[in-house]
């Protein structure tokens, strides 16, 4: 594996050890002859700001999902990546250490600041920075506390409708949506709506295209052979939702397992869309490190909207997907 060191940075090995991520690094994914970011990186949230890709994810590779820090990965083409420290849970005043750092999501608020939504202690918190590179400064309290709304409080996300209205998304076992404040630091719990979506497990995501709303999510546990991404379509966020249909499922023929927990992003100024999702760490022999559910990697693929309003199913492959921005 060939890696390129950033200035004032040591070259990392391929052991994928997890540390505090005190230094940025650069890596070229072409050396892998595969699509994924080379580190164990799960629960991806891909965003585009100011002509660059920004990827926020769970730093995987720790037993029992026990990572305690977040990084941000930055690229111009989905191949060459830089990594910067985003948030360490030791800096979060309400973190007790009972659960790790999971499932971050990013949004730019109405003031132009960047808000990182994240899970710790099975609660959802926020942290703020002036740039998407971070580092992010955590707020003093979580915005959704453990045990509220009758579901496991994980997997935050944000949907911004065409009129600028912001919605907060979250849930495990049941999907929830609620109006989100312009500063993206509070939600209106009195207007929260619980959605019944197939066999919803986690990672609710919403996007809009051609006047239709698309809700997508993961079903089953990440270690389950039936773990997959499904979606439904509606003309209104209130429903009714048609579906569900499969969007991403595992490809045992290519030894690609654990495909799920995604997000979807539009390339500004185009009708091109990208889906980011994780899978078990791949090995061509069929031996993979990710069978325990704690060793996952993030991959990317184009997402196509079909004329009938459906989404073309994404079929996991071994191979590169490179999409330079500004082209």
Placement of each model-derived feature along the sequence:
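Carbohydrate-active catalytic/glycan-binding domains of CAZyme proteins
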Residues: 1-327
